[in-house]
From Swiss-Prot:
One of its GO terms (cellular component) is cytosol. InterPro entries: Acetalactate_synth_ssu (IPR004789), Acetolactate_synth/TF_NikR_C (IPR027271), Acetolactate_synth_ssu_C (IPR019455), ACT-like_dom_sf (IPR045865), ACT_dom (IPR002912), AHAS_ACT (IPR039557), AHAS_small-like_ACT (IPR054480). The keyword Transferase applies. It catalyses: 2 pyruvate + H(+) = (2S)-2-acetolactate + CO2. Belongs to the acetolactate synthase small subunit family. Gene3D superfamilies: 3.30.70.260, ACT-like. Chain A, domain 2. This is Probable acetolactate synthase small subunit. One of its GO terms (biological process) is isoleucine biosynthetic process.
Length: 159
């Protein structure tokens, strides 16, 4: 089962390497990892998706809490907002452009670059939406793909 863990850490050099090292030493595989600054310049937020049972996730959380730079660790189990972003360079010959534009609009994606023979399309949404769009674009020929990991927040007024 996939679990999403939010980690608030000090925004300092080497923190990401220590977190990744913790996973490596314990033999845990990171499915997805995103890191960025928060509303405070001195803090970063990591969103980590890990595959495993509840016992594995419990151990990961305990180990993360032991790191000096860790401020807060929480598993996102409640109702949450989760998003990914994907940029896809897709082959777009003149006779297929209309179809590609139509699918892009249906998914509320955006064409962010146009060249003679391709589009770069930006799609955001939950994991299933992004995956479904990628699957539809395969028939046109994906030339390049860059996909972020998941970012997530618990719904409501929680902090």
């Amino acid at each position: 089962m996939k679990h999403t863990i939010a980690v608030l850490v000090e925004n300092k050099p080497g923190v990401l390497a220590r977190v990744a090292g913790l996973f490596r030493r314990r033999g845990f595989n990171i499915e997805s990892l995103t890191v960025g600054t928060t509303e405070r310049d001195d803090l970063s937020r990591m969103t980590i998706v890990v595959e495993g049972d509840d016992k594995v996730v419990e151990q990961v959380i305990k180990q993360l809490n032991k790191l000096i730079e860790t401020i807060k660790v929480s598993e996102i189990t409640e109702s949450s907002v989760e998003r990914e972003l994907c940029l896809i360079r897709v082959h777009a010959p003149p006779e297929k452009r209309g179809e590609i534009v139509e699918l892009t609009n249906i998914f509320r994606a955006r064409i962010v670059d146009v060249s003679r023979d391709s589009f770069i399309i930006e799609v955001t949404g939950d994991e299933d939406k992004v995956s479904a769009f990628i699957d539809l674009m395969r028939q046109y020929g994906i030339k390049e793909l860059a996909r972020t990991g998941k970012v997530a927040m618990v719904r409501g007024n929680k902090k």
